[in-house]
Amino acid sequence: MTPTLLSAFWTYTLITAMTPRPNNILALSSATSHGFRQSTRVLAGMSLGFLIVMLLCAGISFSLAVIDPAAVHLLSWAGAAYIVWLAWKIATSPTKEDGLQAKPISFWASFALQFVNVKIILYGVTALSTFVLPQTQALSWVVGVSVLLAMIGTFGNVCWALAGHLFQRLFRQYGRQLNIVLALLLVYCAVRIFY
């Protein structure tokens, strides 16, 4: 990979990992509501699911030309529906202000999110088909970059969870407002899948 292409790869992956997306918003919300330690299950589920999805993206990238466009479109709708459901759960979740506390999202729920999270699927397919496959079709490189993509995504999730933890007091004071803003950001993510 040339230095220019490598620079573009890092720019794309880091910006994509750090900008708001369903995983980051969920990590922020979980750490704000439950603290970083309680959010480790959510982060672990995301990380494992993310890795598996990136490895699946490696396989998809090899055969992208033969994928049925209707199947990709159906996956987009399923992902958008799940993201909107997640937005609803966050918007309506109890806050400290309400005197109630929702349970943290489970490992398996955050794991399952990855398989309908169109944003990370597009992230993986785009990175692999743009930066890796034109340079090499060696399976070891494709798998290695898939693992790297999952690590970069996990880094973004952890950064957002740490922000939620660090600003927990402020966020808890304005919990209802924060939940609504986070829910609206998730709805925005769902809409951006199509536009």
Swiss-Prot record:
Membrane topology of this protein: Multi-pass membrane protein
InterPro entries: LeuE-type
Gene Ontology molecular functions: amino acid transmembrane transporter activity
Catalyzed chemical reaction(s): O-acetyl-L-serine(in) = O-acetyl-L-serine(out); L-cysteine(in) = L-cysteine(out)
Similarity comment: family membership: Belongs to the Rht family.
Membrane-crossing residue ranges in chain numbering: 47-67, 70-90, 105-125, 142-162, 177-194
Protein role: Exporter of O-acetylserine (OAS) and cysteine.
One cellular-component annotation, GO: plasma membrane
Keywords in alphabetical order: Amino-acid transport, Cell inner membrane, Cell membrane, Membrane, Transmembrane, Transmembrane helix, Transport
Disulphide-bonded residues: none
Source lineage: Bacteria, Pseudomonadati, Pseudomonadota, Gammaproteobacteria, Enterobacterales
Subcellular localization: Cell inner membrane
A GO biological-process term: cysteine export across plasma membrane
Keyword Cell inner membrane: yes
Name under which the protein is recorded: Cysteine/O-acetylserine efflux protein
